[in-house]
Amino acid sequence: MGQKVHPNGIRLGIVKPWNSTWFANTKEFADNLDSDFKVRQYLNKELAKASVSRIVIERPAKSIRVTIHTARPGIVIGKKGEDVEKLRKGVADIAGVPAQINIAEVRKPELDAKLVADSITSQLERRVMFRRAMKRAVQNAMRLGAKGIKVEVSGRLGGAEIARTEWYREGRVPLHTLRADIDYNTSEAHTTYGVIGVKVWIFKGEILGGMAAVEQPEKPAAQPKKQQRKGRK
């Protein structure tokens, strides 16, 4: 039976950046890894309704810097920054070093695999038909410029006695092409019949410059120059 490698893991260092970017010696490595896990667990619990896509952790000079990618930055920040200050203190307590929290907005949540998977799971928990939820997610992603998308759900679909897997795909999703920018993520819907797993693959195009092209900040689109019309004297 054929098995699939994790689409994000195989592309790390090729077209995908790491979610934790720090270096440590042998003594500190395990502690840093443990605190990273606990920080992510804490933030995902506190920001369960804030549409968090990914959490990036850096450790510059005995401190911790956390960047939260979210589709709803207002919920993370709170009134006058109260909520983000509470999060900063919580992260500092867990990590044991001074903490800094940055917020990055996800402009197109329909093209983010984690947010799409979470959206489908929330619909399944509200008893929306699974086929309708899948097709809606696929249509929204393709409408906003995805080159391809595949959505898979598995479990007791529609309350059936026997669990099964169903999937829906549109466009191209080339899993073997390493330069392909494929966003992959999973989520779980906890229904009265049991857990339903959701997997989402979104193909956004090919990255030809490798990591150098990924890490370059996007340049603003150049404004076309207006031609001056010469008036008659």
UniProtKB/Swiss-Prot annotation:
It holds the Pfam family Ribosomal_S3_C. One of its GO terms (molecular function) is structural constituent of ribosome. It comes from the Bacteria. The keyword Transmembrane does not apply. Keywords: Ribonucleoprotein, Ribosomal protein, RNA-binding, rRNA-binding. GO terms for biological process: translation. GO terms for cellular component: cytosolic small ribosomal subunit. Coiled coil: none annotated. Residues 39-107 form the KH type-2 domain. Part of the 30S ribosomal subunit. Forms a tight complex with proteins S10 and S14. Binds the lower part of the 30S subunit head. Binds mRNA in the 70S ribosome, positioning it for translation. Belongs to the universal ribosomal protein uS3 family. This is Small ribosomal subunit protein uS3. It comes from Cronobacter sakazakii (strain ATCC BAA-894).
